[in-house]
């Protein structure tokens, strides 16, 4: 598993180290994400918004990945918890989160220049959408790539296998960002797959897979930057498995104390 966290070496070797402004932006996105996530959780408990999924534990993955993308050419297809850390693509996302969870139709209506698709509650559907977008970009000769976030549980859905197979066949410029947070609601990873890692599954589709420390935003950024270079260079897809741990609830509708071991 790739990580840049090593007390005996520089955090990120030159020339891959982002400048101070980028590092501060990543940190700000992570703090914003946890703040917004906590606020939305509390609002749900007050009965002021509907069910929502906290991002706690995945902030570094999303902020790190977003920092490696170009918001003017690349497209992001999130699941239901990443928007909190995607402010780099546009602040309208945060307005959309609040409106969506209040049941307002404008919550799923993003500005035309925002390269983030509205999230889907149905598991893994956004993976197929990302591959379709990436393939279309390739056909039209558009610059950039598509990146889709999904969880370990979504990798058990048929949509994932169909999308990954098509992406491999068509060499679509897409990045599969699998967030392995240890749990698919209450199902642990040990009961989710018999594979050595989720990253290893990529080889069956004809493209590489890597595993990265999901608590290390710079390692995630570096992995996504390499995957992006591969995608826009015409070499096809890549799967990046970011390993982290879900801190608390899957969503406001469940009770993790019923299945997660006590800390």
Each language-model region and where it sits:
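Glycine/aspartate-rich loop-and-adjacent alpha/beta segment that forms the canonical ThDP
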Residues: 2-12, 230-263
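Short, proline-centered helix/strand-breaking motifs
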Residues: 173-175, 208
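Cofactor-binding active-site loop characterized by glycine-rich and histidine/acidic residues
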Residues: 35-38, 42-170, 188-194, 199, ...
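Acidic, glycine-rich active-site loops and adjacent beta-strand->loop/helix elements
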Residues: 80-85, 150-156, 178-184, 215-218, ...
